[in-house]
Amino acid sequence: MGSAGPVPSRPASGDQERNVRLGLRANLGQFSILVLLNAFVGAMVGLERTVLPLVGTQQFGLASTTAVLSFIASFGLSKALINLAAGAVADRVGRRRVLMVGWLLGIPVPVLILVAPSWGWVVAANVLLGANQALCWSMTVNMKIDMVGPARRGLALGLNESAGYAAVGLATLAAAAAAAAYGLRSGPFGLGIGIPIVGLALTVLLVRDTSGHVAAETEQLGGPQSPPPPRSGLGNILAFVSWRDRDLFACSQAGLVNNLNDGMAWGLLPIFLSRAGLTLGAIALITAAYPLSWGVLQLGTGSLSDRLGRKPLIVAGMALQGVALLAMVKVQGEGLWLATAIALGLGTALVYPTLLAAVSDLAHPSWRASAVGVYRMWRDLGYVVGALAAGLIADVAGIPAAITAVALVTLASALLTLLRLRETLPTHSGSASSASF
């Protein structure tokens, strides 16, 4: 599967190296802190998901859907490019340092949106938000992967993504309530000023680096899991993950399409529901139900992939996303739209942690963070593609046409994944036996 690594992590030293154990139970304290931190990371995005498209249309008077969705494109492009570098940098300098930088970049975001005199400021703030999400979310993912080892990788990623996206949903509801009480910007983003500050403080005071865990897993593997990428360096890993390896290619395209439809949902659903005559409270409930169900259900789907395998969940989840989006434009009424949002969340819950686990299965520990960074780059470029394509289609043919087009692309991706991806779950006789729960 994976290979001997071109980008070694910093070695652990002294007592840390001797005391390191892989497994969820052995690292429960640090793991729990990182789960909490990822909830703070998710809350940063949740502040925007209902209110920011409405800020664009109602406060800044943007008539073009493409212009409204430009904040998602800037977020996605920043997040994608920094994801690519974040993994490689983390393999060299350690995860904790990168996590701290991510929180520092998040501190100006709510302030810039609060005081923005033009939409350009909001777009610029989302460049910083993309960097914050890339660095912080990537590092919480990689540190959990490092700690638990292969045997509970799906469970670990399910817990991580569950915390993050449940927080997205809860923050979406809180932001809508604050917007109704104090204004579209003053309420949500005044509330959000403290989030990155608390996240940074918790990281500095409580988080330890996981270099020793990477070294321990590499030692337990006793060598490469599969033939190495032919040359060392980030450029080679980029090519290997993007197209040279058929399984990693399948994961990368599925990740891109997943976030393509998420970017569309983030930008278009609030406007679609607003034009249908729903109140801000009803819009918030439906738009929050999607990430909230996505987050909560990942508690089970990540662990399920450890037992059933990665491929069935990924293919089924992509197909369910496509069907849910098609249904969304066909039904009418708050209750039915809520049901389709929950179905979309279930589909995403099946896909999201499982794709990360599959990429982690395929990558050797010594270059795993770089491989995950490349995958996350492609996944988050989906925000750019989704925002721009959906915005252009909506401007030309209407929002229902844009949602339908994204649904069809998602179904095509499910078929491609079915045909290209092989099962990646390690066997109990291989690396999966090296860690204990």
Segments from the language model and where they lie:
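Helix-to-loop junctions at the C-terminal end of transmembrane segments
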Residues: 82-94, 297-309, 394
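Helix-loop boundary and gating motifs at the non-cytosolic
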Residues: 25-76, 247-250, 254, 258-276
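Structural signature of the two symmetry-related core transmembrane helices
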Residues: 97-111, 312-327
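Cytoplasmic helix-loop-helix junction between adjacent transmembrane helices
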Residues: 125-166, 357-358
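C-terminal membrane-cytosol helix-exit motif in multi-pass small-molecule transporters
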Residues: 194-219, 413-422
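Interfacial helix-cap and linker-helix signal at transmembrane-aqueous boundaries
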Residues: 56, 89-90, 177-182, 273-274, ...
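Residue-level signature of mid-helix packing/kink "hotspots" within the transmembrane helices
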Residues: 76-84, 169, 291-299, 383-384
